[in-house]
């Protein structure tokens, strides 16, 4: 981003701290909490407000697994890495559950359903189930639709849950032990003599020993390192008025994850997806909904939930996700500023991986623990081996 001379108030106040975290979504807030818990002074800079980005614009579904069905993850990453990704998401779910209970915020643990739209997807779900069983992952498959909506196969995953992501993050921001500056978009990051870092934002300048960028899709706007590594990708969602009847309680994920839905405690239906029908149009930072995708979502809703035919759609919104090149989060530090760290590129699964990834980054920043397969340098290695 750029900031004019007239808009720049960063020189009006300067703060010094041990660590500055950029981004007050679920990753940045939890990272700040972890680092502050180790006795370090922490400042969080947020461009808008807590959970303003993808964290507060998703479906609030805490799911295990990656963007792929499990057998596809095994084929793509190899069995060992696919299983490590699964374990990371399982650990992440445990973290979110514990914090939700600590905060007293919403935690609806009714499990999740992977739903097949047709026989081809049913075959893939069977393969996914077999691969999950091979790795002792708890799940169940059935070829009878428990929702009675015409889905042809269902993999049930116990323990997955739904949250209210904004209230969750607001509660964390109040208890994280760090100083938060909202409406403080960062427009410059520069090294200081002696090894520190200076971050200039709209409201304040922060000088610190280390910084961490937890801005996901917006990382390329902060540093060119991310331009070829993180792709801003828009997702769209709608929410109906309450139906008056609870039809199902699980978090639902179908059409290979391209549609996802849940029924909220007030019986309204939240539905997102349809992006794959308009891939090229759904890239970039523009916050808007489109008639094509919203129409597709409404058609899906009426096909599978005709009870919603007379319900008014109360909310339509979009959110910008940060897609990594390989679908795995990117963690590391900037080549030109090694004390500026980052955790970005969650590929639509920030609630599934974000907190556990922040935990890995905190251990790396404070104790030098190896990032292993989360290390963003893997992309350079992949590029060097590409013919």
Where are these regions (language model features)?
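N-terminal Rossmann-like FAD-binding beta1-loop-alpha1 element of flavoenzymes
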Residues: 19-44
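Glycine-rich FAD pyrophosphate-binding loop
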Residues: 37-57
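Helical element adjacent to the flavin cofactor pocket in flavoenzyme catalytic cores
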Residues: 155-209
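Flavin-dependent oxidoreductases
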Residues: 189-269
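C-terminal catalytic lobe of FAD-dependent flavoproteins
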Residues: 302-387
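Extreme N-terminal leader/targeting segments of oxidoreductases
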Residues: 1-19
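Flavin (FAD/FMN) cofactor-binding and adjacent substrate-gating region
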Residues: 2-4, 68-74, 94-174
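Active-site lid/adjacent beta-loop-alpha segment flanking the redox-cofactor pocket in flavoenzymes
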Residues: 246-337
